[in-house]
Regions:
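Glyoxalase I/VOC metalloenzyme domain signal
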Residues: 1-97, 111-168
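Structural preference for solvent-exposed beta-strand-turn elements
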Residues: 101-104
Length: 168
């Protein structure tokens, strides 16, 4: 998909280091700098990162990726009980910044440094299952160039809700 990955399986994207390991597909766990969760946050496998940052004085943050990705815009988590997941996130020191409710769905947003956590779930609890990682949204330098690079692997480019932004 056009990401630059080093021999140790690290992929630097902006201020975030993705560690690619074998096994399950998709986002399986995360490490949050300074957050001690005891191993999990409402079912989300969570490890504590101590001052981990890919940037160093002799190396700028992020890597150069042929797909044009320059940052992680947001990570999406789903939960059958968003209030329970919000409480779990607050218990480790994360505070909601904004909540949007429409129809039968609720979205709550948290800031994780330069990256946003978007929690999505039903407006009313719908089961007692754990929260799950659902997806990652990337920021690219030039969405048209990324579209040409990825071809059919990228959805249709369209205007975003935010003025002046486009998404795919």
């Amino acid at each position: 998909m056009g990401f630059t990955v080093d021999v140790a399986g690290n992929c630097l994207i902006g201020d975030v280091r993705l560690v690619l390991e074998g096994g399950d597909q998709g986002l399986c766990a995360w490490s949050l700098d300074g957050i001690d969760s005891g191993g999990g946050i409402d079912g989300l496998a969570t490890h504590r990162a101590f001052g981990a940052t890919p940037a160093a004085p002799d190396r700028p943050a992020g890597g150069r990726h042929p797909n044009g990705v320059v940052a992680i815009d947001h990570v999406v988590v789903t939960s059958p009980d968003p209030v329970r997941t919000i409480n779990a996130l607050q218990a480790v020191g994360l505070e909601p910044r904004r909540t949007r409710e429409h129809a039968a769905m609720r979205q709550t947003f948290f800031r994780l440094g330069p990256t946003i956590l978007e929690l999505v779930g039903p407006a009313a609890p719908d089961g007692d299952g754990p929260a799950r990682f659902w997806g990652i949204a990337f920021t690219v330098a030039d969405i048209d160039a990324t579209g040409r690079f990825l071809g059919n692997h990228l959805g249709r480019i369209k205007d975003a809700v935010q003025p002046g932004r486009r998404i795919a």
